């Protein structure tokens, strides 16, 4: 966000600061308004609005000015800190170079002194008498053994100190890195006090203290003389310094431990004895160097790392070595010159130790400076850590403020998300269940319409068989067609079954074989039959619970095209329980039936037409609707060439009327008017002229014979009368005349007939009782 004067800050930070600034100003304004309690006049509302808008603009300007001044002050502070850090870095670099050159000069002087002492000892030792050497060999071995123990103990202590000093730590690394930037002039006084304190603590031994004080006057001027040379030298890089130190250490080892390999065997023994003393001298020097400054090939170890101050054990060890050296000088002064040289070497090693101690005091001052710089660096690191923690605290405070400001909205948002997820899961499960239910409903509906009704109906349909009597006058081929048929259990009373079938199925036999769907059979008795309706009732007894009574429907409510099922036993028992499906093809059909098989129709059967497959053996079978209720009984089919699926069933309402009388009476009483008739369609021209029939009359019947004292005779009918209408219905032939008369079998009321007599039309009432 650009706020002017080349200051750019993040937009979120700008908004946050602006919000805080405005909040503080608004709070102050509210306090002032609360104190003043000034009333605002309604007439000056427009002016007040303009002033408010102007105040808001001024408020933004004040915020930008305050923010820009704050950022400028922060930039100035940053630049001042950078300048101070660069200045401190330069001071530390110069101090580092000065200390580095001083340390190198001291190490060079020590190396040169070591080489001179070792050459002197060797030359004097080899000039001594061989006999004196042999006489003192045993004593030398004892003393050398003691010296080895002392030197080994001292080496262990030195190695432990070296291990501690050479181990790099994170604090040392930070001290070496940040020491250059933390030196200031104020540290010089502290370094001086530290040097005095360390020198006083490190020289508690009276003997060593006197020697050190006596030698300081000799060594310090030499170091001061070499300061000019050190300052004139060019600073070395870190790899060059490491290489130089490695070469110096190799030279020391070569000068200290190598002697002539071409000497005689007896001299080699003395050299070995001498080597037990020379390593002690070198060990003293190495320990002093190890205390002062550790040089390691590892580049991680800094060459300027100062050692720790001498411990009490080191000082005691030095005192023991000093006492032993004096003891050797007193014991060997009268025997051999070798021991004198050895005491001289020991004395010089003591001087070297004193010089090293003096140098050690100076290095302790450097150590004090290093510790001071380390403390400063630690303070800086602590301040950085505190800044980081403060930043983290700021972030946490921002998050807390954000949560406190918007937690209701966040909770509502989370609740909405959870609610959406739950509702989605619920709706998915509901839709899945709905799809499953739809599939199940579809399967159940399919089973209900096609199979359930069929399975229930099969339990109510039986096979009816009769045996034609041997003396039957009917031809065998015609009688054989009626030997096997079907029946329907329309009523069940306990173990008693009432079965309806066709009259032409039972024939003239009183007993019938009834076979159920489970292949069990019983013998049934014919209660009654009616050839004009082609119906019969058979009574049977069975305790089989699998046989069920069929449900009765209503044939007056049939609909054209209504689906139906036909259940029967075509061709006998082998194919019992056959189910065929179809529809109602026609209603109110009048089907001529030839009962006695004389090729002459005997009766018009009132039926409805179906297109389901019907075969011989289906006669008397059940026709059920989509609800599984009985709506008709199969009665006939048309068996003609090129004619298919034209079958007929007697409506169940007509069946109920017939079977009721057959159960009680065993027969049906029809009215008989006592006449014989001929169809007009069958008359020839002479017969038409004889009865004086008008030419327009094409259909009707001619009375051919009237019984004396019959209903027709009582009604006034005479031979030669032509009947064209009966009971208000057009009369086609004698089958229709019988059908109309039989339809009034229950009421037996008189009916009106329209006749032609002697060519004249007239009406008469025909009595039915």
UniProtKB/Swiss-Prot annotation:
It is found in: Cell membrane. GO terms for cellular component: plasma membrane. This is Serine protease HtrA-like. Residues 1-390 are annotated as: Disordered. CDD domains: cpPDZ_BsHtra-like. Residues 680-733 form the PDZ domain. GO terms for biological process: proteolysis. Residues 21-64, 71-108, 138-186, 264-296, 310-330, 348-364 have a biased composition (Basic and acidic residues).
């Amino acid at each position: 966000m650009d706020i002017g004067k080349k200051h750019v800050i993040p937009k979120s930070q700008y908004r946050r600061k602006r919000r805080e600034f405005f909040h503080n100003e608004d709070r102050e304004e509210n306090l002032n308004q609360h104190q003043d309690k000034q009333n605002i006049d309604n007439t000056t509302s427009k002016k007040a609005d303009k002033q408010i808008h102007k105040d808001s603009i001024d408020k933004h300007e004040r915020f930008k000015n305050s923010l820009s001044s704050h950022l400028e002050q922060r930039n100035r502070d940053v630049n001042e800190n950078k300048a101070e850090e660069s200045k401190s870095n330069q001071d530390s670099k110069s101090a580092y170079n000065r200390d580095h050159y001083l340390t190198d000069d001291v190490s060079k002087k020590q190396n040169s002194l070591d080489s001179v002492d070792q050459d002197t000892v060797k030359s004097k030792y080899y000039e001594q008498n061989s006999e004196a050497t042999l006489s003192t060999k045993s004593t030398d071995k004892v003393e050398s053994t003691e010296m080895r123990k002392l030197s080994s103990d001292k080496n262990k202590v030195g190695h432990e100190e070296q291990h501690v000093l050479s181990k790099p730590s994170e604090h040392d690394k930070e001290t070496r890195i940040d020491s250059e930037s933390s030196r200031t002039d104020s540290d010089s006084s502290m370094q001086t006090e530290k040097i005095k304190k360390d020198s006083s603590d490190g020289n508690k031994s009276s003997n060593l203290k006197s020697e050190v004080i006596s030698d300081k006057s000799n060594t310090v001027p030499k170091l001061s003389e070499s300061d000019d040379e050190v300052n004139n030298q060019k600073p070395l890089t870190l790899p060059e310094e490491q290489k130089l130190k490695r070469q110096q250490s190799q030279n020391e080892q070569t000068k200290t431990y190598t002697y002539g390999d071409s000497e005689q065997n007896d001299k080699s023994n003395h050299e070995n004895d001498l080597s037990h003393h020379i390593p002690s001298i070198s060990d003293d020097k190495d320990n002093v160097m190890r205390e002062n400054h550790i040089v390691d090939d590892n580049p991680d170890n800094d060459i300027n790392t100062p050692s720790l101050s001498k411990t009490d054990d080191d000082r005691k060890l030095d005192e023991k070595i000093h006492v032993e050296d004096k003891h050797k000088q007193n014991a060997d002064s009268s025997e051999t010159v070798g021991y004198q040289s050895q005491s001289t070497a020991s004395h010089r090693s003591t001087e070297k130790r004193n010089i090293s101690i003096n140098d050690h005091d100076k290095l302790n001052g450097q150590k004090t400076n290093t510790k001071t710089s380390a403390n400063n660096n630690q303070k800086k690191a602590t301040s950085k850590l505190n800044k980081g923690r403060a930043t983290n605290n700021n972030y946490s405070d921002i998050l807390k403020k954000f949560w406190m400001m918007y937690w209701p909205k966040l909770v509502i948002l989370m609740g909405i998300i959870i609610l959406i997820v739950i509702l989605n899961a619920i709706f998915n499960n509901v839709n899945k269940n709905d799809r499953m239910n739809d599939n199940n409903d579809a399967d159940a509906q399919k089973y209900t319409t096609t199979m359930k009704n069929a399975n229930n109906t099969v339990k109510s349909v039986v096979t009816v068989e009769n045996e034609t009597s041997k003396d039957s006058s009917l031809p065998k081929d015609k009688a054989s067609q009626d030997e096997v048929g079907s029946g329907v259990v329309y009523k069940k009373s306990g173990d008693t079954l009432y079965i309806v079938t066709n009259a032409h199925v039972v024939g003239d036999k009183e007993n019938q074989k009834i076979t159920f769907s489970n292949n069990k059979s019983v013998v049934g008795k014919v209660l009654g039959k009616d050839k004009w309706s082609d119906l019969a009732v058979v009574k049977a007894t069975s305790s089989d619970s699998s046989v069920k009574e069929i449900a009765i429907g209503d044939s007056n409510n049939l609909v054209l095209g209504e689906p139906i099922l036909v259940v029967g036993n075509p061709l006998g028992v082998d194919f019992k329980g056959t189910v065929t499906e179809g529809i109602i093809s026609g209603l109110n059909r009048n089907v001529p039936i030839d009962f006695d098989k004389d090729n002459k129709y005997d009766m018009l059967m009132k039926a409805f037409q179906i297109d389901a497959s019907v075969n011989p053996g289906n006669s008397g079978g059940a026709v059920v609707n989509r609800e599984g209720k009985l709506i008709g009984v199969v009665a006939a089919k048309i068996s003609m060439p090129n004619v298919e699926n034209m079958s007929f069933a007697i409506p169940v309402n007509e069946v109920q009327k017939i079977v009721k009388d057959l159960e009680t009476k065993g027969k049906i009483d029809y009215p008989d008017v006592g006449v014989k008739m001929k169809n007009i369609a069958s008359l020839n021209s002479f017969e038409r002229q004889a009865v004086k029939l008008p030419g327009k009359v094409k259909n009707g019947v001619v009375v051919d014979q009237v019984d004396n004292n019959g209903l027709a005779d009582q009604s006034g009918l005479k031979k030669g009368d032509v009947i064209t209408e009966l009971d208000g219905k057009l009369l086609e032939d004698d089958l229709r005349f019988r059908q109309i008369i039989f339809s009034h079998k229950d009421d037996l009321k008189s009916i009106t007939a329209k006749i032609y007599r002697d060519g004249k039309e007239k009406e008469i009432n025909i009595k039915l009782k």
